[in-house]
């Protein structure tokens, strides 16, 4: 019976050990394991949220970069249009100024030509009168001379 009492004593000691472990050791171990499981789950969820946030941030950055490029392209196109408009305006203004200068120069040339013709007509008339006086060798009075010059100028 000795063996039976030993087994019974060991069984009682084992039951006491299991009860002690169930009461004092098992709850802190389970709490630590559950806490660690929760931390791991929270870490995984946080990593997933961070990945989603990163994807959203990358998509947003890509959209903003595309928008910035589009805006830059629009600004460049507007600048090119403005440059072309300024060049066209400058060309038109230069053309108008050239036409104005050419018109003024032409008017001055025409006026100078007219003045030179009048001067030449007067000189030709004076030479004709002087030649006529010498040929006729007589003196023509001033009124007749003026009348002859006027007729000669009108004919020229």
Curated annotation (Swiss-Prot):
**SUPFAM superfamilies to which the protein is assigned, alphabetical:** F1F0 ATP synthase subunit B, membrane domain (SSF81573)
Show the InterPro entries listed in the entry: ATP_synth_B-like_membr_sf (IPR028987), ATP_synth_b/b'su_bac/chlpt (IPR002146), ATP_synth_F0_bsu_bac (IPR005864), ATP_synthase_B_chain (IPR050059)
Family matches, as CDD domains: ATP-synt_Fo_b
In Gene Ontology terms, what is one molecular function of this protein?
proton-transporting ATPase activity, rotational mechanism
- Transmembrane regions listed in the UniProt entry: 11-31
Q: Name one GO cellular component term.
A: proton-transporting ATP synthase complex
- Source domain of life: Bacteria
Under Gene3D superfamilies, the record lists:
F1F0 ATP synthase subunit B, membrane domain (1.20.5.620)
Record keywords, A-Z = ATP synthesis, Cell inner membrane, Cell membrane, CF(0), Hydrogen ion transport, Ion transport, Membrane, Transmembrane, Transmembrane helix, Transport
Topology in membrane: Single-pass membrane protein
Compartments where found = Cell inner membrane
Task: Give the chief site where it resides.
Answer: membrane
Q: What does this protein do?
A: F(1)F(0) ATP synthase produces ATP from ADP in the presence of a proton or sodium gradient. F-type ATPases consist of two structural domains, F(1) containing the extramembraneous catalytic core and F(0) containing the membrane proton channel, linked together by a central stalk and a peripheral stalk. During catalysis, ATP synthesis in the catalytic domain of F(1) is coupled via a rotary mechanism of the central stalk subunits to proton translocation. Component of the F(0) channel, it forms part of the peripheral stalk, linking F(1) to F(0).
Similarity comment: family membership:
Belongs to the ATPase B chain family.
What interactions and quaternary structure are annotated? F-type ATPases have 2 components, F(1) - the catalytic core - and F(0) - the membrane proton channel. F(1) has five subunits: alpha(3), beta(3), gamma(1), delta(1), epsilon(1). F(0) has three main subunits: a(1), b(2) and c(10-14). The alpha and beta chains form an alternating ring which encloses part of the gamma chain. F(1) is attached to F(0) by a central stalk formed by the gamma and epsilon chains, while a peripheral stalk is formed by the delta and b chains.
Q: What is this protein called?
A: ATP synthase subunit b
Q: Which organism is it from?
A: Erwinia tasmaniensis (strain DSM 17950 / CFBP 7177 / CIP 109463 / NCPPB 4357 / Et1/99)
């Amino acid at each position: 019976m000795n063996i039976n009492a030993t087994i019974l004593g060991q069984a009682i000691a084992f039951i006491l050990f299991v009860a002690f472990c169930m009461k004092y050791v098992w709850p802190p171990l389970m709490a630590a394991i559950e806490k660690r499981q929760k931390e791991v789950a929270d870490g995984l969820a946080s990593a997933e949220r961070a990945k989603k946030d990163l994807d959203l941030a990358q998509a947003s950055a890509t959209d903003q970069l595309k928008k910035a490029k589009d805006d830059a392209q629009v600004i460049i196109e507007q600048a090119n249009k403005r440059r072309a408009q300024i060049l066209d305006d400058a060309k038109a203004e230069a053309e108008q100024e050239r036409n104005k200068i050419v018109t003024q120069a032409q008017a001055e040339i025409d006026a100078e030509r007219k003045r030179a013709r009048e001067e030449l007509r007067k000189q030709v008339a004076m030479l004709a009168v002087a030649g006529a006086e010498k040929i006729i060798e007589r003196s023509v009075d001033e009124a007749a001379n003026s009348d002859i010059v006027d007729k000669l100028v009108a004919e020229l």
